[in-house]
Amino acid sequence: MVRIVYEEGLEAIAKRIAQASSGDIVKLENAMEAPGVLEEVDSIGLVYCKCGKDISDRMVRFIKEGLGSIELKGLEYLFSICVCEGSAKPQYALKVVNRLCSQIGCLPSYSKAVSSDDKTLEEICRDVSKESIRLADGSPFIGLYMKANKKRFKEA
């Protein structure tokens, strides 16, 4: 099951991605109050805003304290969607999420930016709904990294 954690104001985007992947959504604040809602899922998606060139303090706290406090052994994959408007460059925000996730023992297998452009969102929905994303599409060495560094991931 896919569960998508989204920041306030991004519910419509999170719902579209969840529908494409037959998953459901949880507001960031609710996931912070009860991080256990993420323990029984095999896939977690993070949908967050780019704030300046960084991500919000709420999302930083959620990754460190929320995701970091639960058992991720059942997690098959984690994906990260950065929402930015206009021609903003999201690379730094995506790197921040990757770094924070690696500190708690996991890495997103898929990271992408989306704007209000439907074409980009449709591409993300298509990618997330594919089974091939579970193989860390675009980042083929994530599994090796996690094993070599004894990171938390689903046991084979």
Q: What is the meaning of each model-derived region?
A:
Residues 2-12, 16-29, 33-156:
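FMN-binding flavodoxin-like domain, especially the glycine-rich phosphate-binding loop
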